């Protein structure tokens, strides 16, 4: 047994011996030839590429089993542009380049390495060696680093079995290579006497990888895109060949491709190999080096020094650009700006120079920047000065920003210009603590205190910079991330700014700064603000928005914070909606969404519920690849909800996603509005634009928003101030107002009404416009009372507008010159390569914009003239680049897309009021001897730049345009010239016939469009004249042939209808008419014109109109005569009934239209339309079936529906040219094809040149349409075509007002025993002979009150009193007539209009309020108010109209109660004029909250409530009225009248038969779903307006019994 153990230990020791795994024999010298190749070009073998070949001989001395010494000798390199090949290029095919002695000495310095188990574990370099030289030597050692066998403890059993078979082996192991510590896959293959080792690197499984990334912090995390869309894809494969246990050759091939939309567009490739030359004994030892021990992984020390210099400026320990002398930097910059000045117009070359200047400025110290300022800036012209300022801001290093701030403080740069430059600083590529401190100091400086735009920009920029180093982003800097102490420091600074703020705007600015920073530790401060009810609502909402950048960092934390905020009904609706909006962008899981849906279904605030539904629905339909999981989850939870939002809800959210799933690219437009019930303006409006490009998600690429709190107060107070200027009060009106106010105050005193005081005054009212760009708040524009007061005081003096000051401001001629250089984006990623050079992949879009011009305004007595003369010039280049860098060479490939625009413009606009007309003229002028140029150029370029021996001297790169030969063959030449309007237009270039984005990036294209005017100025004029209304005679309007046989009615009523119609026309023609003339003239050079005249003649009430339009234009193309158009339209509407009786008795209820049009040049086309807008047969049947006699409010509401016109009949006769007939035929075919599944047609023989159309809309749902078209040859029928819900016209009087109230208003109904409040809460409460307060403005300055009472105890009739600030109005109905008293005096019906009172029909009177109206029919009081009214300051039986159902019962002293009786009593006006009906108001059965479901349930189940001493009453209580439902497969039918049923727990004892009318509707319709849900809880009250579908006999109980 002992012998076995000893043998095992010996075997293990032998296996672990490095001698068996070593590559080199001790005390031996090996010589290897090293060859390295850099290749930059397109991913094809058919194009040229820039190639650099580096070669040397490597002396390698194996000192012992572990250490080797190395030295490079015979170093040389060559570089040229030659065709790509899979073979190594020959040295002769490349141009020999000279290597300086200094660089050669560095490369020849020796180095030492330790090898363990075949891998290079440690490296030592000479202390004199440079970092780039060390990395070059690492690339050679990298070729000698090889693991010949898998670690025994990491081998699987299969691998151990394979180990026994020496022919092949495969294993995975983590290993350090030049490119990082990553997983490596090994394959070992025996081929004869050779052993081939192959290893490949899996970059998806790296522990560490030396790489940097800048400029990516503005993107959001898109997990769905990360799976498929890798922008840069590296591949590295090593091959080692051994023969007789000696390394014969080692080769590595790395390919780095740039992918766009899943296709490779450019590539960089590195190849390196060492080849065995000879082996010998050591004759001349390589000097041993004793530098610090380092790893084989690529060293980023040089990149780290550069980053430190950019971020820390002169405080950095090492200046990596010290080798370049200050004079040489100044000379290069001087030459750059000299060339920019020489370019009168901006060109792509100008853009290239700006990019060079930015790169050079980043290398400068403070002293060097001062030198540039004194040498170049102070002596330059204005254009160069502006460009220098912007390039310094774009450079964004600590030194350039410090230099700019220095000149801000000296005011050599104006504060407004400084604020503009700080916008570029926000996007700096190298954010740091030093830069943030500079910006905070600037924001707190005395200069910023004086200039608010500068202070705002400094704070916002500070927040954006802090995010760059203190928050988790996609950037990968080398300097360690910010510590917790650093994060806490900036949170304290920003929160101190918040706490020191006095105004709401300053607090909002502080929170936007904190939001820009996106620090995770800020969440604790923000949560406190969100949850603190003492904070103003605007602050809490802004704190929610400040969480936006933490959605990827801590999504669950945000959900945990915001979900309770959303669900808490005590919070304001806009805060809850903002919380939901922010929470949805954290991509919540399904359980969170289930909470949201549950809250939506039980939500009492309809704005919150509707907004929630819209958000979920829009996300469920999103095609944005970053929202795919969320879309699935939202779709799933919406399947189980029955909630349907009301149509009139204004709070909403919508998306327009435009994405290509294959390319992982696209854009999305979002729009959201948040309204509150008691605000006229939206609380929040957002319109945003986000992009996904190749999987890179820019969530807030651009967003414009508006938010406000109580800003209506500011507007109203401002208007009130303006209305007082120059006005004298009317004494009589003043007395009337005082009288009305006194009556309102008496009501308040008698009822002990506590005023609903506004919680926030106008000082806290404010509004904010903001612009968000790349997730950063960019601009914040506050508007508050102080701002508006300053403007009003500036232009209003002594109660009158200061016209002179305004005119002086407007008429000043203003010359301006704007030059702005900017980078729309700049991103950079640097990764190591296996040849020791860093590969930089970058994208940027430098742009220069210049605008020179003049604007002037000339004011005349009755007119004004605006002249704008500008010359905008824009040049931009999009650069995508892959670049290798060595001190000896710079090589790479880039794809360039350049665009240029230069267009001189002159625009003149004149407005002039002449004797009887208003004339508006717009003139667009193309100046003479000026050229407009639009050019686009794309090309891929390979480049090589070899510095001269003097490192500092700039050498232009050797460039060669390359292209994909296959794609290039798809291009076509364009060379076209046009002559139009006296302008010469040239379009020439070389463009792809069919293209995709990858094709554009890989081909050379150019296109130029020029517009040149060498003659006199070319003017394009548009002139509009609008004439005054003039009196005229209506007898010229003739309705001769307006009726067609298809318009005849049933039951032989046509003749009677026609006589009635012509009589009505004659009566209208006897009245005074009015006419108007509008002309439009468009004029262009070369006698091109379009002239139009529009003449209208109508009566005073627009019952009958004649519209004529004549148009003429100059002939075009093949026309030889002037083209003309003449049309005449006649229209007549029927009388507007105000009652159902009038509607039934009115013979003519249709709208008649007649149109004649004639157009053409030599040949004329003519078409005649006669149309009739009428009621369909079903709609007329609905009117006839209304058996019950309705009066008052129910009658009028039914009249609106019964008077709808849902069908149009059109008869057309035509004489068309062949061309016009073909056009109409094609349109007709398109309609049939689009509705293929619902169309049927048959061949017929009808009258020639005559078409009949009938179109009817289903009047109930208004979402289905039938259409029949009869042509001379066919009859086409479309049935049940689904359309968006339409609003049908109705001829009922005041129908438009009624429909407006239904859509946008809130309504309250009160009768003698029941109230339906503004917020749709229905409860039972009795009216007595004492006045009850129905609705009142309960603010501190009340404007109206509505009261109602019973006329006497035994009557159902009511008496209504309306108190306005001007008068008191009392209305009652006596002998079917309304008796109206104003301030105690009876008013005749003819005088009602002057008191804003109107009688509709015989049974309805309307009293207008300051904001709203009261409708009264003698039995019911209906009060209509805007849905946003009185700022939650209404009170009375109708509730507070705040959108919440839970707080409806607020008593007169502003106390919330659940006792309906207590609530009712508080609004009872007791005085000596009435006797209180104590029995009636004390009886419990008269009170009931029908909306409260739990209360209803208890009512049904409690038997004690139904006990009575009278059998009749007991039977009545045993029975309940419910809507009977009959369900069928595709429809649901409801009983129109409620049917008696036994209460729960009781069974019927006696029954009787009764005929019940039913109305049916489609099962999927919205009404069906709503009524089904409502019928389970209560009687459906809205069914009386629906048509009768069938009548059926039903057994109903008459007595119930409990068993």
UniProtKB/Swiss-Prot annotation:
Domain VWFD: 1306-1475
Gene Ontology molecular-function annotations: lipid transporter activity; nutrient reservoir activity
Top-level taxonomic group: Eukaryota
Keyword Magnesium part of the UniProt annotation: no
Pfam families: Vit_open_b-sht, Vitellogenin_N, VWD
Disulphide-bridged cysteine pairs: 1308-1438, 1330-1474
Disruption phenotype: Simultaneous RNAi-mediated knockdown of vitellogenins vit-1, vit-2, vit-3, vit-4 and vit-5 increases life span, causes accumulation of neutral lipid and an increase in lgg-1 foci in the proximal intestine; however, does not affect fertility or pharyngeal pumping rates. Expression of transcription factors pha-4 and daf-16 are increased.
Cross-referenced SMART domains: DUF1943 (SM01169), LPD_N (SM00638), VWD (SM00216)
Domain Vitellogenin: 24-685
Sites where a glycan is attached: 1266
Compartments, as annotated in UniProt: Secreted
One GO CC annotation: extracellular region
Tissue specificity note: Expressed in the intestine of adult hermaphrodites.
UniProt signal peptide: 1-15
Classification via Gene3D superfamilies: Lipovitellin, beta-sheet shell regions, chain A, Lipovitellin-phosvitin complex, chain A, domain 4, Vitellinogen, superhelical
Keyword Secreted tagged: yes
Keywords: Disulfide bond, Glycoprotein, Secreted, Signal, Storage protein
Main location: secreted
PANTHER family according to UniProt: VITELLOGENIN-3-RELATED, VITELLOGENIN-RELATED
Functional note: Precursor of the egg-yolk proteins that are sources of nutrients during embryonic development. Together with other vitellogenins, may play a role in modulating life-span, acting via induction of autophagy and lysosomal lipolysis.
Record protein name field: Vitellogenin-4
Lineage: Eukaryota, Metazoa, Ecdysozoa, Nematoda, Chromadorea
């Amino acid at each position: 047994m002992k012998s076995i153990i000893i043998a095992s230990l010996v075997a293990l020791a032998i296996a672990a011996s490095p001698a068996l795994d070593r590559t080199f024999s001790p005390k031996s010298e090996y010589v290897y030839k090293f060859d390295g190749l850099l290749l930059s070009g397109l991913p094809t073998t058919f194009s040229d590429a820039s190639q650099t070949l580096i070669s040397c001989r490597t002396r390698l001395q194996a000192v012992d089993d572990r250490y080797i010494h190395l030295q490079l000798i015979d170093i040389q390199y060559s570089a040229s542009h030659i065709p790509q090949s899979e073979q190594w290029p020959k040295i002769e095919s490349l141009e020999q380049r000279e290597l300086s002695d200094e660089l050669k000495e560095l490369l020849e310095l020796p180095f030492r390495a330790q090898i363990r188990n075949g891998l290079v574990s440690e490296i030592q370099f000479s202390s004199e060696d440079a970092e780039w030289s060390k990395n070059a030597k690492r690339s050679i050692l990298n070729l000698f680093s090889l693991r010949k066998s898998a670690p025994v403890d990491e081998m699987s059993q299969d691998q151990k079995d394979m180990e026994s078979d020496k022919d092949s082996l495969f294993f995975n192991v983590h290993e350090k290579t030049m490119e990082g510590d990553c997983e490596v896959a090994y394959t070992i293959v025996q081929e004869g006497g050779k052993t081939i080792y192959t290893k490949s690197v899996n970059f998806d499984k790296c522990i560490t990888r030396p790489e940097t990334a800048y400029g990516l912090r503005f993107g959001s995390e898109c997990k769905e895109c990360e799976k498929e869309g890798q922008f840069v894809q590296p591949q590295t494969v090593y091959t080692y060949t051994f023969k007789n246990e000696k390394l014969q050759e080692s080769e590595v091939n790395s390919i780095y491709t740039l992918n766009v939309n899943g296709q490779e567009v450019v590539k960089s490739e590195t190849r390196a190999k060492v080849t065995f030359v000879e082996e010998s004994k050591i004759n001349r030892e390589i000097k041993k080096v004793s530098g610090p021990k380092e790893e084989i992984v690529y060293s980023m020390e040089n990149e780290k020094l550069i980053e430190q210099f950019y971020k820390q400026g002169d405080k950095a320990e090492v200046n990596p650009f010290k080798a370049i002398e200050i004079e040489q930097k100044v000379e290069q910059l001087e030459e750059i700006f000299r060339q920019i000045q020489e370019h009168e117009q901006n060109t792509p070359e100008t853009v290239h120079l700006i990019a060079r200047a930015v790169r050079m400025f980043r290398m400068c110290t403070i002293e060097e920047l001062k030198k540039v300022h004194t040498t170049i800036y102070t002596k330059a012209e204005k254009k160069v000065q502006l460009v220098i300022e912007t390039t310094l801001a774009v450079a964004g290093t600590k030194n350039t920003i410090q230099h700019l701030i220095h000149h801000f403080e000296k005011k050599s740069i104006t504060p407004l210009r400084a604020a503009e430059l700080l916008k570029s600083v926000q996007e700096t590529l190298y954010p740091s603590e030093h830069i943030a401190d500079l910006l905070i100091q600037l924001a707190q400086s005395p200069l910023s205190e004086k200039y608010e735009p500068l202070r705002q920009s400094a704070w916002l920029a500070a927040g954006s910079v802090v995010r760059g180093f203190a928050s988790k982003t996609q950037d990968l800097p080398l300097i360690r991330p910010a510590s917790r102490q650093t994060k806490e420091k900036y949170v304290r600074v920003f929160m101190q700014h918040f706490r020191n703020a006095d105004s709401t705007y300053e607090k909002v600015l502080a929170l936007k700064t904190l939001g820009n920073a996106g620090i995770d530790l800020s969440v604790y401060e923000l949560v406190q603000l969100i949850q603190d009810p003492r904070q103003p609502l605007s602050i809490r909402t802004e704190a929610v928005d400040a969480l936006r950048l933490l959605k990827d960092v801590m999504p669950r934390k945000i959900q945990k914070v915001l979900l309770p905020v959303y669900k808490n009904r005590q919070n304001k609706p806009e805060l809850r909606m903002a919380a939901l909006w922010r929470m949805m962008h954290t991509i919540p899981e399904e359980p969170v969404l289930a909470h949201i849906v549950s809250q939506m279904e039980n939500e009492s605030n309809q704005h919150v519920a509707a907004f929630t539904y819209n958000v979920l629905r829009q996300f469920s339909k999103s095609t944005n690849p970053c929202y795919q999981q969320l879309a699935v989850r939202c779709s799933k939870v919406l399947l189980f909800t029955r909630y349907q939002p009301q149509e009139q809800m204004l709070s909403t959210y919508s998306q327009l996603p435009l994405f290509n799933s294959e390319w992982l690219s696209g854009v999305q437009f979002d729009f959201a509005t948040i309204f509150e019930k008691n605000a006229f303006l939206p609380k929040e409006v957002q319109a945003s634009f986000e992009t996904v490009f190749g999987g890179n998600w820019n969530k807030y690429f651009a967003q414009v928003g508006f938010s406000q709190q109580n800003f209506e107060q500011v507007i109203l107070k401002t208007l009130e101030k303006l209305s007082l200027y120059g006005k004298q009060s009317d004494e009589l009106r003043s007395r009337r107002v005082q009288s009305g106010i006194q009556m309102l105050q008496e009501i308040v005193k008698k009822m002990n009404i506590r005023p609903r005081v506004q919680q926030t005054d106008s000082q806290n009212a404010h509004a904010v416009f903001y612009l968000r760009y790349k997730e950063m708040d960019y601009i914040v524009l506050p508007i508050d009372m102080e701002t508006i007061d300053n403007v009003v005081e500036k232009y209003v003096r002594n109660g009158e507008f200061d016209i002179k000051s305004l005119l002086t401001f407007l008429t000043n001629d203003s010359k301006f010159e704007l030059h702005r250089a900017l980078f729309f984006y700049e991103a950079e990623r640097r990764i190591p390569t296996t040849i020791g050079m860093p590969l930089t992949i970058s994208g940027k879009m430098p742009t220069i914009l210049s605008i020179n011009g003049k604007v002037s305004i000339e004011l005349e007595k009755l007119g004004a003239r605006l002249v704008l003369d500008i010359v905008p010039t824009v040049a931009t280049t999009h650069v995508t680049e892959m670049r290798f860098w060595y001190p000896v060479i710079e090589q790479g490939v880039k794809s360039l897309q350049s665009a240029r625009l230069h267009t001189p413009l002159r625009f003149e606009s004149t407005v002039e009021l002449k004797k009887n007309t208003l004339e508006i003229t717009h003139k667009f002028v193309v100046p003479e001897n000026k050229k407009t140029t639009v050019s686009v150029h794309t090309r891929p370029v390979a480049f090589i730049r070899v510095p001269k021996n003097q490192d500092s001297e700039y050498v232009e790169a050797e460039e060669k345009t390359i292209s994909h030969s296959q794609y290039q063959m798809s291009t076509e030449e364009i060379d076209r010239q046009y002559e139009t309007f006296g302008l010469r237009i040239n379009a020439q270039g070389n463009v792809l016939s069919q293209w995709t984005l990858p094709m554009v990036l890989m081909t050379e294209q150019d296109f130029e469009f020029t517009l040149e005017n060498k003659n006199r100025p070319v003017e394009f004029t548009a002139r509009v004249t609008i004439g005054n209304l003039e009196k005229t005679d209506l007898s010229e309007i003739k309705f001769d042939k307006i009726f067609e046989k298809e318009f005849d009615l049933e039951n032989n009523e046509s003749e009677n209808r026609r006589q009635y119609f012509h009589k009505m026309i004659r009566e209208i023609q006897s009245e005074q008419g009015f006419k108007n003339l509008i002309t439009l003239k468009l004029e262009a050079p070369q006698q091109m014109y379009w002239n139009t005249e529009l003449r209208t003649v109508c009566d005073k009430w627009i019952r009958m109109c004649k519209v004529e339009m004549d148009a003429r234009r100059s002939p075009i193309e093949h026309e030889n005569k002037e083209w003309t158009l003449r049309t005449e339209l006649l229209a007549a509407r029927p009388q507007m009934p105000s009652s159902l009786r009038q509607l039934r008795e009115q013979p003519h209820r249709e709208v008649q239209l007649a149109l004649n049009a004639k157009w053409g040049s030599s040949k004329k086309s003519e078409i005649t339309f006669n149309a009739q807008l009428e009621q369909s047969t079903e709609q007329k049947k609905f009117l006839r079936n209304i058996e019950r006699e309705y009066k008052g409010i129910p009658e009028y509401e039914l009249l609106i529906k019964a008077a709808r016109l849902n069908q149009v009949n059109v008869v057309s006769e035509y004489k068309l040219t062949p061309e016009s007939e073909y056009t109409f035929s094609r349109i007709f075919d398109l309609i049939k094809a689009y509705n293929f599944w619902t169309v049927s047609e048959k061949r017929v023989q009808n009258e020639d040149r005559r078409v009949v159309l009938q179109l009817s809309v289903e009047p109930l749902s208004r979402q289905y349409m039938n259409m029949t078209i009869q042509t001379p040859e066919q009859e086409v029928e479309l049935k049940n075509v689904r359309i968006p819900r339409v609003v049908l016209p109705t001829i009922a009087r005041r129908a438009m007002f009624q429909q407006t109230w239904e859509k946008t208003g809130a309504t309250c109904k009160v009768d003698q025993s029941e109230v339906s409040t503004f917020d749709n809460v229905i409860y039972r409460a009795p009216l007595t002979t004492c006045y009850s307060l129905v609705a009142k403005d309960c603010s501190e300055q009340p404007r109206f009150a509505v009261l109602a009472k019973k006329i006497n105890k035994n009557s159902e009739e009511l008496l209504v009193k309306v108190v306005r600030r001007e008068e008191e109005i009392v209305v009652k109905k006596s002998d079917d007539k309304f008796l109206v008293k104003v301030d105690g005096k009876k008013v005749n019906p003819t005088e009602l209009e002057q008191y804003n009172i109107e009688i509709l029909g015989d049974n309805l009177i309307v009293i207008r309020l300051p904001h709203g109206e009261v409708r009264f029919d003698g039995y019911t009081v209906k009060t209509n108010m805007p849905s946003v009214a009185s700022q939650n300051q209404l009170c009375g039986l109708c509730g507070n109209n705040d959108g919440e159902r839970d707080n409806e019962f607020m008593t007169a002293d502003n106390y919330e109660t659940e006792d309906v009786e207590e609530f009712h009593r508080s609004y009872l006006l007791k005085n000596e004029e009435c006797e209180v009906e104590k029995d009636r108001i004390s009886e419990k059965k008269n009170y009931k909250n029908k909306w409260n479901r739990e209360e209803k349930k208890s009512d049904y189940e409690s038997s004690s409530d139904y006990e009575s001493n009278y059998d009749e009453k007991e039977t009545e209580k045993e029975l309940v009225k419910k809507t009977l439902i009959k369900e069928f497969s595709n429809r649901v039918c409801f009983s129109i009248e409620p049917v008696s049923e036994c209460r729960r727990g009781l069974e019927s004892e006696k029954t009787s038969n009764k005929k019940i009318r039913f109305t049916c509707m489609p099962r999927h319709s919205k009404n069906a779903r709503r009524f089904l849900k409502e019928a389970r809880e209560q009687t459906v009250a809205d069914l009386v307006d629906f048509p009768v579908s069938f009548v059926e006999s039903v057994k109903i109980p008459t007595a119930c019994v409990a068993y």
